[in-house]
């Protein structure tokens, strides 16, 4: 194998610094990702989580840090990516140790569901990090922690989510939540990611479409400003009010995933041009939005609307 270049050596150093893995593991993941450091680190995190979290957490939950290090060191040769050396391993264990006790504090049923924070625990936890249940930031936290359903957090999602943003205490988590609250209305990519994650989060178990009432509740959250969203209504057109009125006239039908996602795109297009200069009959919009455009034009008395 040819020697590493100066740039590759620097990447190995960066990988080791971020993950606390050894040089051999760093080089392996970097080669597999064609020396893309970010992809290599993501691959490392995704691989180590399912393979080793159980082995790491069990001793952390029942023993002190020193004893946990001794127990986990047995698995160092068996688990790819575990930090080498007792000092690095101790740092790793301390990090997970803190999360273990944080999770234990908020679990609803430690015996029945030891790896899950349920609704009651989630409410207490969100209160501690100063997040209200009826604000967009609450949904952003759910997206960050990959919550499987509303008001539920898993151990793996909790750990991986907060570790990805380097938050390991209630104070840091509260600060990150406050930062999200500021960024969501002004960062379209972040807003869209949270908005889209809300669809599966709010689905009733066993259903593929969102109940109309739930969809309207979430639109009122995302498309108004009081709880951290973006105002869709303007001084000239009450877009959100008309959208809900239009759907009510059509029978309050359930909302599918495509329509849910495209409504947010449509909202931003109406901000660019309320006169629909961007709209085309040949566009790839859902039929419901095509019909809404015609409905709005007729309601506003736009020229030519009656002939469409």
Curated annotation (Swiss-Prot):
Q: Which Gene3D superfamilies match?
A: Cullin, PONY binding domain, DNA helicase RuvA subunit, C-terminal domain, EF-hand
Q: Name one GO cellular component term.
A: ubiquitin ligase complex
A single GO BP annotation from the record? protein neddylation
Q: What is this protein called?
A: Defective in cullin neddylation protein 1
Q: Extract the SUPFAM superfamilies matched here.
A: UBA-like
> Mind listing the UniProt keywords for this protein, alphabetically?
Ubl conjugation pathway
Specify the DCUN1 domain's residue ranges: 94-297
């Amino acid at each position: 194998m040819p020697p590493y270049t100066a740039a590759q050596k620097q990447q190995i150093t960066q990988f080791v610094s971020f993950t606390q893995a050894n040089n051999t593991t760093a080089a392996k993941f970097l080669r597999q990702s064609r020396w893309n450091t970010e992809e290599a680190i993501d691959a490392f995190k995704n691989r180590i989580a399912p393979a080793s979290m159980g082995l790491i957490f069990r001793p952390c939950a029942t023993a002190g840090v020193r004893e946990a290090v001794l127990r986990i060191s047995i698995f160092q040769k068996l688990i790819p990516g575990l930090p080498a050396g007792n000092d690095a391993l101790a740092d790793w264990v301390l990090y997970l140790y803190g999360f273990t006790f944080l999770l234990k504090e908020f679990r609803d049923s430690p015996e029945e569901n030891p790896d899950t924070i349920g609704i009651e625990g989630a409410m207490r936890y969100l209160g501690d990090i100063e997040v209200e249940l009826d604000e967009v930031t609450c949904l952003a936290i759910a997206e960050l922690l990959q919550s499987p359903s509303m008001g539920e957090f898993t151990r793996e999602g909790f750990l991986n989510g907060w570790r990805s943003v380097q938050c390991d205490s209630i104070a840091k988590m509260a600060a990150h939540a406050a930062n999200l609250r500021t960024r969501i209305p002004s960062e379209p990519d972040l807003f869209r990611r949270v908005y889209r994650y809300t669809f599966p989060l709010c689905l009733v178990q066993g259903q593929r479409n969102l109940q109309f009432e739930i969809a309207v509740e979430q639109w009122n959250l995302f498309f108004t400003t009081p709880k951290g969203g973006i105002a869709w209504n303007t001084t000239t057109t009450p877009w959100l009010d008309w959208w809900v009125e239009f759907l009510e006239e059509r029978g309050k039908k359930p909302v599918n995933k495509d329509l849910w996602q495209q409504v947010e795109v449509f909202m931003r297009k109406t901000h660019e041009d309320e006169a629909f200069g961007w709209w085309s009959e040949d566009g790839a919009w859902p039929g419901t939005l095509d019909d809404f455009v015609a409905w709005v034009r007729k309601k506003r008395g736009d020229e030519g609307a009656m002939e469409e």
